[in-house]
Design a protein with these regions (language model features):
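Threonine-centered tandem repeat motifs in low-complexity domains
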Residues: 24, 85, 101, 106, ...
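Solenoidal tandem-repeat scaffolds enriched in leucines and small polar residues
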Residues: 33, 65-66, 84-86, 93, ...
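A short loop-to-beta-strand structural motif that recurs across blades of beta-propeller domains
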Residues: 29-33, 94-97, 152-157
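Inter-blade boundary loops/turns of WD-repeat beta-propellers
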Residues: 35-37, 72, 101-103, 130, ...
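Short glycine/acidic-enriched loop and turn motifs that connect beta-strands
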Residues: 24-29, 86-91, 143-149
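Beta-propeller blade termini
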Residues: 7-14, 19, 65-74, 80, ...
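Beta-strand initiation motifs
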Residues: 38-47, 104-110, 162-168
Length: 174
């Protein structure tokens, strides 16, 4: 990796299939690397997800959110790779991507889920059945800071496994 910021690692462990995933900020892009047995996995190295704001910007938080690994969809393929993509512009919309182990799009996830008007993201998403329907949801947190004065807010999102919004709620932090 040649990026200037690297997320915390996530480990995919399913029988003999074991890989380490990291996201990297490199040249204004978010890239994902997969490593198995010390070598890069060709379908992931790197997988360019898209543009993001420079995490070294002093006006932003200095962390990349980590990848989450969980059984998100109804596919029988096992666990999926949840990639949080911070906003491409300051105050823009962050996104969530869900991939299969081989780097393809997971069922119902052939495009990103945009966290509209949510702002920046630096917290790692969590996955679990938070509404009791038997299906996993992706829980993400975004925030907006206007830079001066009041108006900072945090939004908690619950995204269904089928790429639809379960719920969102926003908290004013002023």
């Amino acid at each position: 990796q040649s990026g200037t910021e690297v997320s915390s690692p996530a480990v995919y462990e399913d029988g003999s299939r074991r890989k380490v995933f990291v996201s990297v900020y490199d040249n204004n892009n978010l890239e994902v690397y997969a490593i198995q047995g010390g070598s890069g996995v060709s379908s992931w190295n790197p997988k360019t997800i898209g543009s993001i704001v420079n995490p070294n910007d002093v006006n932003l938080h200095p962390m990349l959110p980590s990848i989450a690994i969980a059984d998100v969809t109804d596919e029988d393929a096992g666990k999926e790779i949840v990639v949080p993509q911070p906003a491409a512009t300051d105050g823009g919309d962050s996104q969530l991507w869900v991939y299969t182990l081989d780097g393809g799009y997971a069922e119902d996830w052939d495009s990103a889920y945009s966290l509209d008007s949510g702002g920046d993201m630096d917290a790692t998403p969590a996955v679990g059945d938070v509404d009791g329907d038997g299906d996993a949801e992706i829980i993400a947190i975004t925030w907006i800071d206007p830079g001066s004065g009041d108006g900072e807010s945090t939004t908690v999102w619950s995204i269904n496994s089928d790429h639809t919004l379960d719920w969102e709620t926003t908290y004013d932090q002023d």
